[in-house]
Amino acid sequence: MWNEFKKFAFKGNVIDLAVGVVIGAAFGKIVSSLVKDIITPLLGMVLGGVNFTDLKLTFGKSSIMYGNFIQTIFDFLIIAAAIFMFVKVFNKLTSKREEEEKKEELPEPTKEEEILGEIRDLLKQQNSSKDRA
């Protein structure tokens, strides 16, 4: 049983997942700070305040604090937009780098490939001249 657990716990996928969770948690703190400390105050200046937490419906002694729910949805949308923009920029940068790497990886054609290309071009010329006649 111990050996099975070791195989499971130290398998590459499990360790990769653990690293991803730790990095994701740290990145989540960065994004939350970006939203809370930078984006929300900027939106608050533009929109004249963005705090819904005090909104509530009161029925006698009971209150439904729906404002906190709306604020949580609003925060989620801002966080989702910030992550979307980050991922979009990241994907654009990585795709440019991958394209450059692909260009560098293309080998020079061998002499045989060059000759085969010339033969192909000659055959195309012959076929097109036959079609005209």
Curated annotation (Swiss-Prot):
UniProt subcellular location: Cell membrane
One GO CC term, this protein: plasma membrane
Keyword flag Ion transport: yes
Single GO term (MF): mechanosensitive monoatomic ion channel activity
InterPro entries, alphabetized: Mechanosensitive_channel_CS, MS_channel, MSC/AndL, MscL_channel
Keyword Transmembrane: yes
Membrane-spanning segments: 14-34, 67-87
Membrane topology note: Multi-pass membrane protein
Keyword terms of this UniProt record: Cell membrane, Ion channel, Ion transport, Membrane, Transmembrane, Transmembrane helix, Transport
PROSITE patterns: MSCL
Alphabetized HAMAP family for the sequence: MscL
Protein family according to the UniProt entry: Belongs to the MscL family.
UniProt-listed NCBIfam families: mscL, PRK00567.1-4, PRK13955.1
Quaternary structure (record): Homopentamer.
Function as written in the Swiss-Prot or TrEMBL entry: Channel that opens in response to stretch forces in the membrane lipid bilayer. May participate in the regulation of osmotic pressure changes within the cell.
Matching PANTHER family: LARGE-CONDUCTANCE MECHANOSENSITIVE CHANNEL (PTHR30266:SF2), MECHANOSENSITIVE CHANNEL MSCL (PTHR30266)
UniProt-recorded name of the protein: Large-conductance mechanosensitive channel
